[in-house]
Amino acid sequence: MTELRHDRPQPRSPRQDRPEARSQPKTQAEAGRFTRRTVLKATGAFGLAAVAQPLVGKRWSFIRDLGPAAATPLEHIVIDCQENRSFDHYYGFAPFADGFGPPAGWDQPDGNGGTVAPYRFMDLATPDVGHSWDAVQAEWNGGAMDGFFTTDGIWALGYYTGEELPFYYSLFDEFTLCGNYFCSLLGPTWPNRFYLAAGTSGGITTNGVWGYGVFDYPIILDLLEAKGISWKVYNIGWDSVPYGNTDNVFVFWKRWAKDRRTHGNRGDYLNDLRRGRLPQVAFIVPSYARGWDEHPPADVSVGMGIQEDLVTALRESSVWERSAYIITYDEHGGYFDHVPPPHIDAFGLGIRVPTWVISPFAKPSHIEGTVYDHVSTLKLLEHVFDLPTLASVNHLFDVSTPTGPNYEAANGASAGPPAPPRDELAVLGDMTECFTF
């Protein structure tokens, strides 16, 4: 593995079914007092060549050779995808985020010649902010990362600390935080969750698609099924309505929309742990309606509390010593982040999101600098369970998959030509870098 290191200034201590947020207040008077800073000016265009530039966190790591799958002690992998939080919004000012949070003086132009600095959220429930395809393009601004305030207002610049997120911050003592995990696409929920299932969004860039069984191309469940790897999707907080979980991405695929394993619930998860029957691969889908997925304006302590319960149940089970639990977020939700994402194709990568790797084999008190996106979780499953890549089985991508207008997403359209899965791209790590084995 070859690493390119980049020393940066130290940080300061301290859908269709869910409409996008309206414009938020943009004045300091509306949200309290803020410190004025000097704007950090972006230099040059941020294009495909930026993949080779050391712009990410404290270090940028490349995987040169995918190589054959190797034996690992992991027998169970749990993947939980929460909603709408950025890395800097949750951990940018954490004392352990040295070199991965905003550098001293980082701020945002206010659109009137001044600047506005990030500030601490004192409320656990705050308004939703813009995270549509168009809004995120403006926030990203070609890699300048200077459009959060002018696009979404003062609410986009709030951050939390360990006082508001005690369970999450406590994880650092024992486990690994990913410092360069990006969502897959510069856009909202559904296309990012498609990457988590399929390694591609099929060209879709908006939440303007919905329906059970509308897709029929291969996803990770097909690979697991073909290899005889047990799996289940646990819908946490959606116990009463069959097929009614609006955050369960797997119901979009014909083969799995009504499969009973796609519709497990919280009770199933707890019972499976008590009986030592946790499947080899488990996906956790917390309820959006109850705010358990942390999607604004939900109280962040509620979703965090659910995560603490789920993680604790795993740690107290007989399978813990052979397990890993990953907590990630589908996209950044419009909240600020200072790191320009690698621009690897017309769709992304997207903005950085917080991601924990919780396992007896996770590197303790460690921030991993390898570049990841949601496809990296698929690469981990492929590595641990010796699966083929989705790119290898999906080379004849179904171009009839509904994608809206067939324009280039890179040129600002709401959709683009279907793109192949990313799980053979060497620029994306497979998350084994987070473990001690």
Residues covered by each model-derived region:
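N-terminal pro-sequences and low-complexity stem/linker regions of secreted or lumenal proteins
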Residues: 2-8, 12-18, 22-437
